Regions:
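Post-Walker A helix-loop "phosphate-sensing" segment adjacent to the P-loop in P-loop NTPases
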Residues: 83-94, 124-125
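The catalytic "switch" region of P-loop NTPases
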Residues: 160, 172-244
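The feature captures the helix immediately C-terminal to the Walker
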Residues: 79-83, 261
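A short, basic N-terminal segment
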Residues: 1-62, 280, 285-292
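Walker A/P-loop nucleotide-binding motif
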Residues: 58-80
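Mid-core helix/loop region of P-loop NTP-binding domains shared across ATPases and GTPases
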Residues: 7, 14-23, 46, 110-114, ...
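C-terminal alpha-helical "lid" subdomain
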Residues: 1-19, 71, 218-219, 226-292
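A short hydrophobic beta-strand->loop->alpha-helix junction that borders the nucleotide-binding pocket
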Residues: 96-109
Length: 292
């Protein structure tokens, strides 16, 4: 599957090529770290988020809803976006400036839990048992001082854990924060989040949905597999973009990005352990059987 004349590791990204000198177990551990792979759909979403972040303050700030199936890669995109815009410290005022605050919607959402989760995210000491008005006042005071440009709320489909009245209250809270702080709010969740927001005409118009869909067989997916292969410290090229391997990967994972990453990482581990040093169809099939 590889050209024997190729220089060992020539198919790898430069930093990954250096890992080939490590013992097998160290290479396997290195593969288990989180990795970021640029691909067109993710880049498009990151560009959309960047445009939101750059929007000048106005009365009605633009917002959006990023949705897709569980493990499709939504959270990884948000983490990449947050990493690209780290906080700074205002030495003169002694205040941390965070352009982006990213949090998770509590599993059982209500105002008290939401404010407590937000305060926890920004590192603000507080009593979770305090009254809603106290938590709200503390949150508003701190956020006005920090001047964030964007609030990201992941797992927003947890809204559906509440009854209709509680869902409306949580949605009104999100609109209130966007208006009060004049910042964009980005909601992230599964398709259930779309259902929840569609029950409120104002929310559905305020938060236009953008979907991160499953992968299908395409040139873009082959480019993704090629980019992923460059980050796996195997001594030989696996040529993952070959049609038979592409179809095996899609059949085993359903086109879910997180499942694809897990499949390829485990297959690469098998390739290291059996000394073949390249992912073959047999490795993919073996991992698929173990995880079925």
């Amino acid at each position: 599957m590889s050209n024997s004349g190729d220089r060992m590791g020539a198919h790898l990204a430069p930093g990954v090529r250096d890992l080939l000198a490590l013992p097998d177990e160290a290479r396997i551990r290195a593969m288990q770290r989180d990795r970021w792979i640029d691909y067109a759909r993710a880049s498009s979403i990151l560009e959309r988020l960047t445009r939101l972040l750059a929007t000048p303050q106005r009365d009605r700030m633009p917002c959006l809803l990023l949705h897709g199936e569980s493990n499709i890669g939504k959270t990884q995109i948000i983490r990449k976006f947050v990493r690209d815009h780290p906080p700074t410290f205002d030495e003169e005022r002694g205040v941390e400036r965070r352009q982006i605050i990213s949090m998770q919607m509590p599993a059982l959402p209500d105002h008290r839990r939401f404010y407590s989760a937000l305060l926890f995210e920004i590192g603000a000491p507080h009593s979770p048992k305090a009254g809603v008005s106290v938590l709200e006042g503390l949150t508003r005071t701190l956020l006005h001082a920090m001047k964030p440009r964007m609030l990201v709320v992941d797992e927003v489909h947890h809204l559906l854990a509440g009854n209709y009245r509680e869902q409306r209250a949580s949605m009104n809270l999100l609109k209130y924060l966007a208006n009060d702080l004049k910042m964009s709010v980005v909601l992230v969740g599964t398709g259930d989040a779309v259902v929840a927001l569609q029950s409120d005409a104002q929310m559905s118009s305020r938060f236009p949905p953008i979907e991160l869909p499953r992968w299908g067989e395409s040139d873009e997916f082959r480019r993704f597999l090629h980019a992923f292969e460059r980050l796996l410290p195997l001594k030989k090229s696996s040529l993952l973009a070959q049609r038979d391997l592409v179809q095996l990967v899609l059949a085993a994972t359903g086109g879910i990005t997180g499942a694809i990453a897990q499949l390829l990482t485990h297959a690469a581990e098998l390739a290291i352990r059996d000394r073949s040093e390249q992912i073959a169809a047999a490795h993919l099939e073996q991992v698929a059987q173990l995880t079925a």
